[in-house]
Amino acid sequence: MKSEWKSFLIWLLFLAVACSALQTILAERSHVSFLKEDTCETWEFRQQHLPAELSDQIKELERTDRNFSEILTVTMLEGKFFPRIIFTDSSLYRKYKPEEYELLKKAYQAVWEDVNCFPVPAEDIFYEDTFGEERLYGGERIHEGTDLFGKVKKAGYYPVLSMTEGTIEKMGWLPLGGYRVGIRSPHGGYFYYAHLSEYEKNIKEGKKVHAGDILGFMGNTGYGEMGTSGKFPVHLHLGIYILSPDEKELSVNPYWILNSVKKKTRNYRY
């Protein structure tokens, strides 16, 4: 009888341990269940909501051999894409969602990894978070970028700099964007600079550029046939685009990226 009772207690203990382990697994799986292959297509991801103080903290951790994109990705996931604190442990995502996690990390790399300077070398530049607001010219659409304005309203006054290194993939006239430059960065992000008044000399498609190189000058071209200008105030429209896993082009919000490099404003005489 004692032997049977002992076996029964052992069986109960085993069952309790197994149930506890199962509950842990279920809780862990539930915690990461919202991460999908197409998470980078969600509106929450496209907002890129990372306050500058958190960006600075991640960069500080990067100096201790921690990977910026790794910390950024898990911080965004744990903060449900609107984080207030930094997270560093990605183990659950790597355990249960390794492929989905790597896809999302790659998307964040395309947006953030190559950015190294503010696009206008002046202290008097101002901008607001208008990503997603309604635009009507050329048909109903949303604003897919951030507009940067300077105190000087003259076209051609402010230089426009490349925020990243990369290759000039597109340039020339667009009915909406006017004279524009599109640069593909090393990690795959497409950085779009629009409404330029003119281009810097020797700028051409296929040319390699470095962060801080002058691309052209802030203007107000666009909203019409080639050469149209003056239909809106002088400003730079900055767009950032990535490719989704199924090769769909997606715009993301540049506002928070701009905030993260505002301290890296270059000084030029012009």
Residue ranges and their predicted role:
Residues 141-153, 182-189, 241-252:
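Small beta-barrel nucleic-acid-binding modules, principally OB-folds
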Residues 111-112, 123-129, 191-208:
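Generic detector of contiguous secondary-structure segments
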Residues 161-202, 227-229, 233-234:
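Zn2+-dependent peptidoglycan hydrolase active-site motif and core
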Residues 166-168, 206-221:
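A structural signal for short beta-strand/turn segments enriched in small hydrophobics and glycine
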Residues 149, 184, 194-197, 210, ...:
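Residue-level detector of conserved, well-ordered beta-strand and adjacent loop positions
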Residues 210, 217, 231-270:
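Acidic, glycine-rich catalytic/binding loops that coordinate metals and/or anionic ligands
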Residues 34, 41-44, 70-179, 211, ...:
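Surface-exposed, glycine-biased beta-strand/turn segments
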Residues 1-91:
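Cationic-aromatic interfacial patches
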